[in-house]
């Protein structure tokens, strides 16, 4: 017997498809703000909920407080004045579509879902029949059905799937990437019911060119974890191979370039000082935690890869000490300039940045540390706030070693190599220069 769609389904689908459904985005960081903007640009009336009062004030004033979200000057104010984009610190009115885009950090190695719970409770206070609720926050498989669903149902007396649509759609935003945007990056959607998947797919089809449906929220949740576990494992392999190449006195960057010429069966990943940011150091740990707790076993490959990547900052410090010793200097008391402290090139995001872990270890070892980063004006190192230094000749010449930790595109690396007495390149940015330069040490 074929199950019929809920009575409200057709009308909800029509409103969503025509852009007439009011949208509420909970959490206006780089994920939520990007989604809110795209929905408003597509003609929807959008309310962004941001509990950080300073950030919310900036957004209401038309200022962009999230540097990694690329917004043309004046657009926030234009959308606000046109009635399509409003920002508030609390949810106090119903919408047709609610999208939860809050942070899901780790706390003592375990998932911290307090922000998801709080957002769910906010939605439950105003949720009505026929609405759509989507969780975009990255989390372990089962969160949408086992954590969010009970909060919504118990707070309303409604039943997910019967009275409102519920789905998970993992965010795939790459901060600062101008080539792969929300519009051209495929969007995975997994609904609690086929109707939920259809409604949420209709919603995202207004802002995404390709929506990919899967059969459940759990499938969508683990898809995101698989993507980032794949990256962590392969980065760990590249790091372990780079260490091995150094042990054998082989240039790892030459090996990587040569291996990448194979047109099939090989995808190049670059070694570096570790992994950082909002995804790679965190998301795979959600999967490992869930496997241990739900199945009672280890995800051994993932946990080994994570261990390798977490040890890379210590390896960088060890290599820096060896390089200084080769120059007749000790790590303790050495003047070390760190080139870049954000976790990725072109970004000012320092969350989980391996560069800061390198800095902490250097300071703890007695080195005198400074840094230059064109995207990070200040950074906390071992509890002390440091200012980014100008990359002038005196700073370069006065350093015992310059350690390249972030591959920012807007740095004159040729000048760095020419002025600094010693350069340790952990990112391969000096590949295009003469590898025989006596002051250059490769990762």
Describe the function of each predicted region.
Residues 2-443:
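Structural/interface elements that position substrates and couple domains in central-metabolism enzymes
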